[in-house]
Structures are given as C-alpha cells and as structure tokens.
Amino acid sequence: MLKGHLSAEAQRFLCNEQPAPSGRSESTLADLRSATKAYITPAVKQVLASTKVTTRHIVINDVACLEVTPSHITASWPILYGFGGGFIQGSAYEDLTIAAPLCAMTGAALIIPSYRLAPEHPWPAAIDDGFSVYQALCERPFACVGESAGGNLVLAAMLRAKRAGLPLPRAVALLSPWCDLDMSSDSQVFNDGRDPSLSIQDSKTAARLYAGDHDITNPDISPINGSFDGAFPPCLITTGTRDLLLSLSVRLARCLRESGVEVDLQVWEGLWHVFEWQHQIPEAQQSLRNIAAFLKGHLSP
C-alpha cells in the first residue's frame, strides 16, 4: 500500500471497504444496473445537497437529457457531459457525483444525454443520441466532458462533427476514456486485479454487447483510430496508475500530441479507473478542481 502517497479515504477504498458492484454478464445485467444505482444514490444525494445545483429532465433533438444548473450561473457556455458504464449500464443520475461538482465549480450548465444502452440498443444508438445533442449545442461556445464510455461518446461525436464540418468544442476533458474497444493494451494486462472498479472480463463483456460483430477499429466505435488534427480543441485527460485503461489514456494523449493538439495528461499515483466518481476522496476533489480550472481557462473571457 502506498500510504505515503494516498489519502486515508483512497486507502480505505483500495482495502475494499467500499467496493463498487461489478461482474458484468448479460444474464445479470439488470441486477448489476440496480445494484450500482443503489450503491451510488446516497453519494449523489449528498453531493446534490452540498453543491446546491438543480436538475431537471429536458428533451433535446428527441433525446432525453438531464440538465444540471448551478445556483449561480456565471458561465455563458454549456458543457456536454457523457456518463460512463461501458455503454451497458450507468445513467446521467449516477454520474452526478462528478457532474454536480463540475457544475458548481465552473458555474456552467451541464447537459447529460440519457443515451440508449446496449444490449437493448447496441452501437450506434449511444453515439447517435450523443451526436444529436451535440448538434444542438455546437452553434455557440461549449465544452465537452466524458468519463470512460462517456469519453468515447464525446470523442466519437467530435469526430462526426469534424467530418460534417460542424463546430468543435473550445475544450474537452476526458476521465479514463474508453477510447479503444480492442482490449489488448498493456495496462489491461498488468492492472487487471489491481483496479478495484474495473476488470478485463467486465470490459470484454461490455465491448461484445455494445459492438456486436461490427469492426471495433471503426473510429465511431474506437475513436482513438480517428483522424485528429491541430483544429481539435485542447484536451485534459485524467487517469491513475491502477487504472485498467491507463494505457488508453497514454496512447490517446500521444496520438493527439502527434496530431498537433494541446494535451495535458494527468496520471494520479495509486488511483484507479474514474476515481473521480468516488466524491469523498480528496484526490477526486482535486482532480475535479483541475478540470474546472482547465475548462474555465479555455472558455471564460
């Protein structure tokens, strides 16, 4: 245990005192979805009370969304936010432990598409939903944030926008982005069993249910394979040394840099996949402050 480098809260999490539900399979998916929501609901309620943000359900381009608004709006630009869950679980509500603090810290409204999930709605349903909302937001300055599968979603939407000649966001923040569904990167071997929130088997199951028999090298499925250039916005990527998808963040950062994109890759010692979801951990709070400062630095006057 890296006691000298981790907060007491992070150490407790790594000791499995607060394990998140896991074990994805098609037969148990409904139970896993319910268990995960029950697990995170107390934290969501606590965060909503402490941040004093408000939420309401809206519809944008026929896609149901959750709008998160700070008590005092100080930013004229919205944030398009993609929630995680391997495209087979998760919801806008469950990601409020990240989205609500970001909303309060930036003073910006967040729009979280409630995109359709696999296996009921496999690819390209989620990306279609995300891109529909993207199209409604992109005519004015805006930012994108996505965690895990939500990072995949916002990247894929940006690549679609680039191909269509639509405006790109002014800045994008990606938290442990699942940007490649080919489960063969180095960290997916050496961090399997070390990451308390994600396993290689869970990831393979999600990839199979989401992509089916489609070519996973398709940039709409694995956006790391997309065509990037210097027109892409500045990007902040966060990950941890225990993150099962650490290698994906490293590879994406290198790909973007080689394409002329401004990238800030922040690798947190001893932390795991989307550690920011655990709002009680001081490192998560600091990472969200970093993300908020990054977004405000690129969008605020």
Please identify what each model-predicted range represents.
Residues M1-S71, P301:
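A glycine/proline-hinged amphipathic helix-loop "lid/cap" segment
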Residues Q18-R24, T55-R56, D62-P301:
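Alpha/beta-hydrolase superfamily serine-hydrolase fold, recognizing
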